[in-house]
């Protein structure tokens, strides 16, 4: 889990735009971030399988 300090640091405006990076709004994870949903792949998969993200359905072909 991300520490509170790292989450707060990510929420602050960076001095330079290239220093800004995205963190999951649910758990604070910095990797596997999905911009459209503002969360990491792990939280996205969990919430999508529970049906808590509107408009997301499981793909099958």
Swiss-Prot record:
Keyword annotations of the record: Metal-binding, Ribonucleoprotein, Ribosomal protein, RNA-binding, rRNA-binding, Zinc
Pfam families on file: Ribosomal_S14
Required cofactor(s): Zn(2+)
UniProt-annotated binding residues for Zn(2+): 24, 27, 40, 43
Coiled coil: none
GO cellular component: cytoplasm; small ribosomal subunit
CC cofactor note: Binds 1 zinc ion per subunit.
Gene3D superfamilies: 30s Ribosomal Protein S14, Chain N (4.10.830.10)
GO MF annotation terms: rRNA binding; structural constituent of ribosome; zinc ion binding
Any one GO BP annotation for this protein: translation
HAMAP family in the record: Ribosomal_uS14_2_B
Function of the protein: Binds 16S rRNA, required for the assembly of 30S particles and may also be responsible for determining the conformation of the 16S rRNA at the A site.
Family of this protein: Belongs to the universal ribosomal protein uS14 family. Zinc-binding uS14 subfamily.
NCBIfam families: PRK08061.1, PRK08881.1
Subunit structure comment from the entry: Part of the 30S ribosomal subunit. Contacts proteins S3 and S10.
Protein's name in the database: Small ribosomal subunit protein uS14
The organism of origin for this protein: Treponema denticola (strain ATCC 35405 / DSM 14222 / CIP 103919 / JCM 8153 / KCTC 15104)
């Amino acid at each position: 889990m991300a520490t509170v300090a790292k989450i707060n640091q990510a929420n602050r405006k960076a001095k330079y735009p290239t220093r800004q990076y995205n963190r999951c709004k649910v758990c604070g994870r910095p990797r596997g971030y999905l911009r459209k949903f503002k969360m990491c792949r792990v939280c996205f998969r969990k919430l999508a399988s529970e049906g808590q993200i509107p408009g997301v359905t499981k793909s099958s072909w």
